[in-house]
Structures are given as C-alpha cells and as structure tokens.
Amino acid sequence: MDWWLSWTVRDYVDLNKSQRQLLETQLDEFHRWHQQTQLKQYASFVEQLSTELDQPLTEDRLQTLNQDIQQHWLESLDYLMPGIDQLFVSLDSEQWQQLLDNITESQEEYARPFLKNEQQRIKQREKRFTKGTKRWIGKPSAQQQLMIHQWAQQLHPTAQLSLARQAQWNLDATELFDQRHDLDSDTRQRRLRQLLIGDKDNLTAEDQQALSDNRQQTYQLLMDLQRSLTEKQQGKLRQQLINYHADFRFLSSKFDDIALAQ
C-alpha cells in the first residue's frame, strides 16, 4: 500500500525535494505500522471468509463485510492523517491547482464511458464487473454472464452524479486549502478527513435512493452468483483466499522477525 500511495501522489502533483522526503518518511512509518498491526487483521478477515464459502450469502452478511472493509480503510486513513495534513499545508497554489486538475481529469476519464448512450453504459458496467469476477472465480458461465448483464441493465446511471460531486468536492477542498494556515491542526485534519471519506448527507433524496437501489441490486447479484458457482469456481475462489491469507501472514511475520532481531 505504501508504494501505491507514493506513486499515486506523484502522479497527481509534482512535489519539491522536501515534500518528497516528507512523503517517503511518512510512508515508511505507515508501512511499519501497517505491517505490524493491520496485516494480521486482514489475514483473520480472509480466513473467516474462507470458512463461510459453503454458507449462502445474505444481505446482512454483505453489509457487515462492507462495513468491515470500510473500517479497515478508515484505520489506515486515520494513521495517515497527520502526514496528509502536513503535505496538504505545504502545497503552494500552483501545486494545488495541478492536483485538482489531475483528480478531475481522472474522474472524467473514469466516467466518460458511462456518459454515452444507455447501451454503451450497460456494456461498460458488464465489462468491468466481469473483469473483476474472472479474477476471483474464473470465466463466468453463460448463466452467470446473463445475471451480470441483467444487473447492469437494472442499475441507475450515476456518472453525472459522480462528476457533480467531484465539482462540489473541488470547491469544498479549495475552501479548506485557502484557510489551511488559519485553522488549528485538529480542525484542519477533521475537515480533511471528511473530504477524503466523502459526504453523502448533502445528496438529494432521489440520488440517495438511486445509490441505495444500486447497492441492493449489487448485493442480490453477489448472492445469486455465489449460489450458481460450479465446483471449479468454488475451488478457484477458495484458493484465492488461501493465497491472500498466506501473503498477509508471511508479510506480518517478516515484521515479527525484524522486531525480534533488534
């Protein structure tokens, strides 16, 4: 995760030497913390998932899994917040505009295929979901592909909403950037955190309902796919989880070995 964060930041904004050093120092500390405290949690999480493969998925279980994943992400974000805050304060106006421009361009590039006609939007949804599915269970059967296609047809379009939210995010983030030297660290970090998490409270009731409907449709698709898995697909899914569990355990044990050697 640390190298991914480093490359992601550098893709969006050109940092000066002191900022690069700050970023690398913060990410080195994050790497040690993440390896020491989080990887064992990930291993336990994946291990628990592997024990549930023979049990039917339920909507409640999917909601819990989603919340668990979100919580893992928030724990990492909270650890990174002081470093994010330092880097945020150090940016000048030119760097800030570059950051906003690149974030907006990335968002528009992602949304562009979904802004075409309905047929193209459905095709893109189906293509992206199928690609992710292949990673976990292999090639979907004809029946499973039909499930994915029907799911893609039923989803509400949200690309325009995403772009509108990005535009509002840019305004809110720029307001905070302009105030960055006038705010105390706690207030600034709290507002930064809220920006990074995303605020859905400002959505209209119609938009909230559309997102909720899409989430329910996706949960239903996942439940239907799980019930339709062949023995070969179940085996691939199980092996994927075993591999992730082994990787997390191995990486966390490397930290334990280093700690014992010191």
Question: How does the language model describe each region?
Answer:
Residues Q21-L23, N102, R125, Q150, ...:
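Mature extracytoplasmic or organellar-lumen-exposed domains after removal of signal/transit peptides
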Residues V13-Q21, W73-P82, D92, I137-L146, ...:
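Short, low-complexity cationic-aromatic patches
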Residues M1-Y12, P82-D85, K116-W136, R215-M223:
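Extended, structured, electrostatic nucleic-acid-contact surfaces
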Residues Q63-L65, I69-H72, A111-F114, E118-R121, ...:
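Short, contiguous, well-ordered secondary-structure segments
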Residues M1-S90, E94, Q98, N102, ...:
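N-terminal Sec/ER secretory leader and immediately downstream segment
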Residues S6, Q166, N170-Q262:
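A cross-kingdom marker for long, charged
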Residues D85-T204:
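Extended amphipathic alpha-helical interaction segments
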Residues L27, Q150-Q153, Q217:
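Amphipathic, charged-and-aliphatic alpha-helical interface segments
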